[in-house]
Design a protein with these regions (language model features):
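Structured mid-domain segments that build the active-site/substrate or prosthetic-cofactor binding neighborhood
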Residues: 3-118, 122
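Catalytic domains of carbohydrate-active enzymes that cleave complex glycans
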Residues: 64, 90-249
């Protein structure tokens, strides 16, 4: 078992993993990979791993891996960032689907999000395009990939998506679930003295409960998680420091 980042870079930190993978493929035909497609610390936080997941699975197949366990959000309430799409992409790639990632994503989004599909794809690509370094499965909202500019662009796109589908339809509910990822990112990055912060937290958890989401942190009750968000924040703009940090009221 080797913990690795989101990219299999033969010249970077993942070189040893790739070396071991190739080595094992030469001595066994029963090679299995346990991979991750989720942020366990923040289920709702955007976790742009689709492109890396696509490339990694293709590489696994090329090397001769027999099976892949692509672990995601296992909480009963679901609602994590793009859970359904990630499961669909992985399932297609693990069969004999040789289409491009864009084709598979469009097929899913057209069927799942309806008229909002083009905006959802734009939203997905906004975060995927912003990955410049490593993506970690315990990243926080103060990660270097999340900026005020990115948050504002996400707000515009996801609101366009909501406006493009009719309230009360299954497509609207699907988009609303994705909207949680923006709302969560926005809320947990607010300063404790931000005007209307309490109202924003109320809005976030009201929607979380309305959609039946039961966990937003791994193995943590929703009640505890709500208390954490109400009393603390993720600090922004702390150079070279991207782990969880709380300022308590």
């Amino acid at each position: 078992s080797i913990e690795e980042g989101a990219k299999l870079d033969p010249n970077g930190r993942n070189a040893q993993f790739l070396h071991d993978l190739i080595g094992w493929s030469k001595i066994t035909k029963r090679l299995y990979i346990w991979d991750y497609a989720v942020n366990y610390r923040n289920y709702l936080l955007p976790f742009p791993c689709l492109r890396s997941m696509y490339k990694n699975i293709l590489l696994y197949k090329k090397i001769g891996v027999k099976g892949v366990l692509m672990e995601g959000n296992f909480s009963f309430g679901g609602g994590g960032y793009l859970d359904e799409l990630k499961a669909y992409v992985a399932s297609r790639l693990l069969t004999f689907d040789n289409r491009s990632l864009d084709e598979i994503v469009k097929e899913f989004c057209d069927g799942y999000y309806g008229k909002a599909s083009k905006y959802v794809i734009e939203y997905i690509n906004l975060f995927e395009d912003n990955i410049k370094g490593d993506l970690w499965l315990y990243d926080d909202a103060d990660s270097e990939i999340f900026t005020d500019d990115l948050e504002e662009k996400a707000r515009v796109i996801i609101n366009n998506a909501l406006s493009s589908v009719s309230n009360g339809t299954k497509e609207y509910k699907h988009v609303l679930t994705l909207y949680l990822s923006y709302l969560y990112l926005h809320t947990v990055r607010l300063s404790l003295d931000e005007k209307n912060r309490d109202e924003e937290v109320n809005k976030l958890f009201s929607l979380i409960k309305e959609l039946g989401v039961t966990e937003i942190f791994e193995r943590t009750s929703l009640e505890f998680s709500e208390n954490v968000v109400r009393k603390s924040r993720y600090c922004k703009d702390r150079e070279n420091w991207y782990s969880l940090y709380y300022i308590m009221k």
